[in-house]
Curated annotation (Swiss-Prot):
Major subcellular location class: nucleus
WD repeat feature ranges: 14-57, 62-101, 104-143, 146-187, 188-227, 230-269, 272-305
Keywords: Cytoplasm, Nucleus, Repeat, WD repeat
Gene Ontology CC: Cdc73/Paf1 complex; cytoplasm; euchromatin; nucleus; Ski complex
Annotated function: Component of the PAF1 complex (PAF1C) which has multiple functions during transcription by RNA polymerase II and is implicated in regulation of development and maintenance of embryonic stem cell pluripotency. PAF1C associates with RNA polymerase II through interaction with POLR2A CTD non-phosphorylated and 'Ser-2'- and 'Ser-5'-phosphorylated forms and is involved in transcriptional elongation, acting both independently and synergistically with TCEA1 and in cooperation with the DSIF complex and HTATSF1.
SMART domains associated with the record: WD40 (SM00320)
InterPro entries: G-protein_beta_WD-40_rep, SKI8, WD40/YVTN_repeat-like_dom_sf, WD40_repeat_CS, WD40_repeat_dom_sf, WD40_rpt
Keyword Repeat carried by entry: yes
Classification via PANTHER family: SUPERKILLER COMPLEX PROTEIN 8 (PTHR44090:SF1), WD REPEAT-CONTAINING PROTEIN 61 (PTHR44090)
Protein name: Superkiller complex protein 8
């Protein structure tokens, strides 16, 4: 029995406002799977994925304004959230308690990402800097300076070597983390870069932009390997599949699309949301996709592996 693409589960009214961010994590100790959602209702919600459904485990309160970005550490034990209140909060996923609140300073920290070793948390800023905080210390350890505009999106490469940032003017920068040097500046888009994602082997970088296009870059040589069109509006999020072959995108055209990175073609489109889809992620095995959007719903889809 091969799995077909299809919607598996729908959590309606998951939040009282638009859901702008989602993450899917797996606890390395006990194997349990967790989905976390961040919403403009100021809340972070922690859901257990069990028996093919989501069960609300915790509602995490603390942010004073909307939550715009969430991530789960690679150990699966800590969640991070950033908000329009300029604070980053770290949460213990086993107790639902806040571990620490980090004042990001007078910056708009729109996007955050755990480093692959879960030791650091990177966040973009409106002054073109990527600030790196220590997860243990909660202090800013160092910054990477793009000398550019407002950074809307960031991503670590899974091998821990690179950090990519996407700015509001469509510029993408790739840093060498070990040296802090700016390796490549990519100018493929003319509009804001909402999201970027590395392939599991860290060889490719996929970018999503308000120009409606998705671009695939060869990281090492900074070559444009492909331009994909298909969404009818802004592309808001992209995430690579653990199978190293597929990636998923979401858009303000209300759709979620699965792409084959090798053939550069769309293999499936989900039209299940009623409004723009802000966040999309794969689970650890690549067999499921989660999406969230302005319709306040969380959707889980089945994917053939």
């Amino acid at each position: 029995m091969t799995t077909q693409y299809g919607i598996l589960f729908k959590q309606e009214q998951a939040h009282d406002d638009a859901i702008w961010s989602v993450a899917w994590g797996k606890n390395k100790k006990n194997g349990s799977e967790t989905v976390i959602s961040g919403s403009l209702d100021d809340l972070v919600k922690v859901w257990k994925w069990n028996d093919e459904k989501l069960d609300l485990q915790w509602t995490l309160e603390g942010h004073q304004l909307g939550v715009v970005s969430v991530d789960i550490s690679h150990t699966g034990s800590i969640a991070a959230s950033s908000s329009l209140d300029a604070h980053i909060r770290l949460w213990d996923l086993e107790t639902g308690k806040q571990i620490k609140s980090i004042d990001a300073g007078p910056v708009d920290a729109w996007s955050l990402a755990f480093s692959p070793d879960s030791q650091f948390l990177a966040t973009g800023s409106h002054v073109g800097k990527v600030n790196i905080f220590g997860v243990e210390t909660g202090k800013k350890e160092y910054s990477l300076d793009t000398r550019g505009k407002f950074i809307l999106s960031i991503a670590y490469s899974p091998d821990g070597k690179y950090l990519a940032s996407g700015a509001i003017d469509g510029i993408i920068n790739i840093f060498d983390i070990a040296t802090g040097k700016l390796l490549h500046t990519l100018e493929g888009h003319a509009m804001p870069i909402r999201s970027l994602t590395f392939s599991p082997d860290s060889q490719l970088l996929v970018t999503a932009s308000d120009d409606g296009y998705i671009k695939i870059y060869d990281v090492q040589h900074a070559n444009l390997a492909g331009t994909l069109s298909g969404h009818g509006s802004w592309v808001l999020n992209v995430a690579f599949c653990p199978d190293d072959t597929h990636f998923v995108s979401s858009s303000s055209d209300k759709s979620v699309k699965v792409w084959d990175a090798g053939t550069r073609t769309c293999v499936h489109t989900f039209f299940d949301h009623q409004d723009q889809v802000w966040g999309v992620k794969y689970n650890g095995s690549g067999s499921k996709i989660v999406s969230v959007g302005d319709d306040q719903e969380i959707h889980i889809y089945d994917c053939p592996v």
